[in-house]
Amino acid sequence: MLSDELESKPELLVQFVQNTSIPLGQGLVESEAKDITCLSLLPVTEASECSRLMLPDETPNHANSSKEVPSSAVLRSLQVNVGPDGEETRAQTVQKSPEFLTTPESPSLLQDLQPSDSTSFILLNLTRAGLGSSAEHFVFVQDETEDSGADFLSAESTDSSIPWFLRVQELAHDSLIAATRAQLAKNAKTGSNGENVHLGSGDGQPKDSGPLPQAEKKLKCTVEGCDRTFVWPAHFKYHLKTHRNERSFICPAEGCGKSFYVLQRLKVHMRTHNGEKPFMCHESGCGKQFTTAGNLKNHRRIHTGEKPFLCEAQGCGRSFAEYSSLRKHLVVHSGEKPHQCQVCGKTFSQSGSRNVHMRKHHLQLGTTGSQEQDQTAEPLMGSSLLEDASVPNKNLVSMNSQSSLGGESLNLSNTNSILGVDDEVLTERASRPLSSVPDVTHHLVTMQSGRQSYEVSVLTAVNPQELLNQGDLTERQT
């Protein structure tokens, strides 16, 4: 019986039957014929000797016909001699019994093959295609009987109507099954040791490949306190650079100065300077472009709704599309408040909460950049509108940034008509409420730095010196 492992691979059996020489069983080999060793199981054609061989006395009433025909008579009709150059020559013996020739009244091989045969498997398409069809047309029919251990003679004595060469092919099947089961058992043992084994199909290509072997990590970091191990030397070399902080690839753009460990990181960074965005979102109606594949991957989660980063804090259960968002969210659970308002000193756990506080209580601050810059750029940490009373004709509005702008100041000169007055933070001498200041109007002043632009709402008067004088009078009255 064909094993379950070979049920989906019948081409192996066909290849074995067509290309393998099967030794004859005991009782079929002549003791005096030393040159006859095996029969080639190549596809049999209509002109071959096997197609014209029939067992004698093939009548419905014969019972022991197999015993009446000696095996020597069968083998004498087909004798294979091996020549000196290794070629097989087929020589017919002089004593050829005429009863082995097929008569017109003899039943066909297709009629001899019955579904109730006791054989384990029968190549039904052998007879359907003239015993010479290709491997892809072979069909293996499995019997309901499970007894496949009967030898050649017992199977032939049970049903002698099936030709003897089909019985030999059945023995070839049983031999192949036993050999394949042994190989599968061997592969199972070696597969447990981590080896990659697979059983190839008839065309020589692997059909099902096993799991990839897990390579041994032999490279271990020698830095104290680091237990990282690596498989590839390139990864190990990159890891050692992180310990030495060896950033040998520096951005050549003016005013940038960023450095990287590997050249590929620098190439990706240069896209931010030249505006190259090779990764595009192909969702309908979107079409956004990004500089890195990681940014595109994070953007696609907006369309799919995927949020793979889950907060593991007890009772929270929030999930995020990006790991950076999860990292910022974890600050809420830790109780840390690293973001401080530079005007009043109030601290916040999120930078967005601090920015909302500044826009609401200290100044009207907005961002007029693009949407992507608005999501990634940090707004101003704090600002102050200063006034120099000693120099009334040289007023200066200064905005100090301590976030992504690197602490540089944004200065606006030639603003003689602009006074540094805020909603709540006034200069020491201007303690009078803004509602009592005459002829005061709102103006928006735009300040730019790099890729960001800011609009600051300030108060102006028709005569700035008059506003300062009123502030002095108010101070004297108090």
Swiss-Prot record:
Q: Which GO terms describe its molecular function?
A: DNA-binding transcription factor activity; RNA polymerase II cis-regulatory region sequence-specific DNA binding; zinc ion binding
UniProt binding sites for Zn(2+) 4: 311, 316, 329, 333
Q: Name one GO cellular component term.
A: nucleus
Changes seen on gene knockout: Mice are viable and healthy, but display reduced expression of Chd4, leading to rerepression of fetal hemoglobin genes Hbg1 and Hbg2.
Q: Where is the composition biased (Polar residues)?
A: 103-113
**Can you name this protein?**
Zinc finger protein 410
Subunit notes for this chain? Interacts with CDKN2A/p14ARF.
Localization annotation: Nucleus; Chromosome
Q: Which UniProt keywords apply?
A: Activator, Chromosome, DNA-binding, Glycoprotein, Metal-binding, Nucleus, Repeat, Transcription, Transcription regulation, Ubl conjugation, Zinc, Zinc-finger
Q: Where are the transmembrane segments?
A: none
What phylogenetic lineage does the species belong to?
Eukaryota, Metazoa, Chordata, Craniata, Vertebrata
Function statement: Transcription factor that binds to the sequence motif 5'-CATCCCATAATA-3', and is specifically required to silence expression of fetal hemoglobin in adult erythroid cells. Prevents expression of fetal hemoglobin genes HBG1 and HBG2 through CHD4: acts as a direct transcriptional activator of CHD4, a central component of the NuRD complex that represses transcription of fetal hemoglobin genes HBG1 and HBG2 in erythroid cells. May also activate transcription of matrix-remodeling genes such as MMP1 during fibroblast senescence.
Q: What is known of its domains?
A: The five zinc finger domains are necessary and sufficient to bind to DNA.
- Sites binding Zn(2+) 5 sit at 341, 344, 357, 361
The entry's Zn(2+) 3-binding residues are 281, 286, 299, 303
Main subcellular localization, coarse class? Answer: nucleus
Keyword Glycoprotein attached: yes
GO BP annotation list: negative regulation of gene expression; positive regulation of transcription by RNA polymerase II
Region described as Disordered: spans on this chain:
84-113, 187-214
One Pfam family recorded for the sequence: zf-C2H2
List the C2H2-type ZnF regions, as residue ranges: 219-243, 249-273, 279-303, 309-333, 339-362
Q: How is it modified after translation?
A: O-glycosylated. O-GlcNAcylation may occur in response to increasing glucose levels and affect transcription factor activity.
Q: Which PROSITE patterns does UniProt cross-reference here? A: ZINC_FINGER_C2H2_1, ZINC_FINGER_C2H2_2
What gene does the UniProt entry assign to this protein? Znf410
SUPFAM superfamilies according to UniProt:
beta-beta-alpha zinc fingers (SSF57667)
